[in-house]
Design a protein with these regions (language model features):
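Short, charged amphipathic recognition helices of the HTH superfamily
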Residues: 41-51
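Active-site- or DNA-interface-adjacent structural scaffold in DNA-acting proteins
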Residues: 39, 53-108, 167-168, 181
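Short glycine-rich loop/turn motifs
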Residues: 111-116
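Single, function-defining residue in the core of a domain
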Residues: 1-43, 83-84, 94-97, 108, ...
Length: 383
């Protein structure tokens, strides 16, 4: 119980420093309890979160489940209004940002969620901003929703931040290229092979016909895309060995090398493991198996997930930095076997029975990682 109280106190202090200027103290408390439940259960099912919270605090499950359920319906917690504070926390001191953008589907509830995630070094893209809608609302409005979310991201970022958007061919719209230019965002976006591309010398071919012999990459600096002649920094067309389909990439930076553009786009994939961590019932938190009738409830649930995942990932990073990951794997390979998120879950569960010297070292490293973000420094330097 003492360990649970300490965890809850830490989470509440952390969220107070993060959202205290926007949320009432009681709402911060409710949010903290729900995050504790998510971290303890590693699930996004409301009943499971409530049961884990009740077990951790020695309370009745019925009341804890109702508390979590009421939180998800609390209109006083407007995720859209919290994004500027959350984004500042998620990016920390970083100012050169690579952001992956993609839609993910929740077919059982007939809903879709647009996600803008920060590409990180550890293989999982960190959620920055998301927006859920009923699929029926997407007809004729999808581009408007994407523009709205990109504009919100721009508003929330420091003026000196440099952003590069990565997106797959579902976003290969020349109007989006122009809009990103208006926002002063860079981009590397894949587009379909049947779209016409005009080289700087005026020659026009379908994108698929610009791929070099044997699938080798070809870069067209200062190219124009589609019949609208949308100017981009460069187009790269490649069908390298091992690729299922050719990549036709529009890039804003015409000075970037062919390899740099290809490597940058390949990092877009890191949003997929994050979707799996959130949605998959076996390998993640199981959101795809949870019925959520209201998109606003889903967005609040995703906020709980984002906070819990970030804290658990930092905890996993702290343990790995101390070499604790060697005790999690049964082999002797040097590479990472468990993701930082998975490691964090394992360390979190082990805390109650962890030897005190190990626990102190882990917490010291964990605090050092969190203090890299100035937003939370005030909490952790008190006392």
């Amino acid at each position: 119980m003492r360990a649970t109280a300490q965890r809850l106190e830490f989470i509440q202090d952390y969220l107070t420093s993060l959202f205290g200027s926007e949320l009432h103290v009681k709402r911060v408390c409710s949010l903290s309890l729900a995050v504790l439940g998510v971290m303890t259960s590693a699930s996004l099912a409301v009943a499971v979160i409530g049961q884990a919270l009740a077990q951790a605090r020695g309370k009745a499950a019925k009341h804890a489940i109702k508390q979590v359920d009421r939180l998800l319906s609390n209109q006083g917690i407007d995720v859209w209004d919290l994004f500027p504070l959350w984004i500042q926390e998620a990016i920390g001191a970083s100012r050169d940002l690579v952001v992956a953008m993609d839609w993910t589907e929740f077919d059982a509830d007939d809903q879709s969620t647009l996600a803008l995630n920060l590409v990180t070094k550890h293989g999982r893209a960190q959620p920055l901003l998301w927006f859920s809608v009923f699929k029926a609302e997407l007809a004729g409005k999808r581009n408007d929703i994407e523009d709205m979310c990109l504009s919100r991201l721009k508003e929330a970022l420091p003026k000196e931040a440099k952003v590069t958007i990565l997106a797959d061919r579902g976003f290969g719209d020349v109007k989006l290229f122009g809009f990103l230019g208006e926002l002063d965002f860079g981009y590397v976006i894949r587009f379909r092979g049947d779209i016409f591309v005009t080289a700087a010398d005026g020659e026009t071919r379908r994108a698929e016909d610009w791929v070099g012999a044997g699938g080798r990459a070809r870069k067209l600096a200062g190219a124009e895309i589609s019949k609208e002649k949308q100017k981009v920094g460069a187009v790269v067309c490649v069908h390298a060995k091992g690729m299922k389909d050719a990549w036709h990439l529009a890039a804003s930076d015409g000075e970037a090398t062919t390899r740099a553009i290809i490597n940058l786009y390949s990092r877009r994939w890191s949003i997929e493991p994050e979707f799996r961590d959130t949605k998959d019932l076996r390998f993640g938190m199981g959101l795809s198996a949870v019925r959520v009738g209201d998109p606003y409830r889903r967005d609040r649930l995703l906020l709980l997930s984002a906070i819990a995942v970030m804290l658990l990932t930092l905890l996993g990073g702290a343990g790995e930095a101390l070499g604790m990951d060697r005790l999690l794997k049964s082999n002797t390979v040097k590479r990472r076997v468990h993701s930082l998120f998975c490691q964090g879950c394992l360390y979190y569960d082990a805390i109650p029975n962890m030897p005190e010297p190990t626990l102190l070292a882990l917490m010291e490293r964990f605090r050092a990682l969190i203090m890299e973000n100035s937003v939370t420094a005030a909490v952790l330097t008190v006392g």
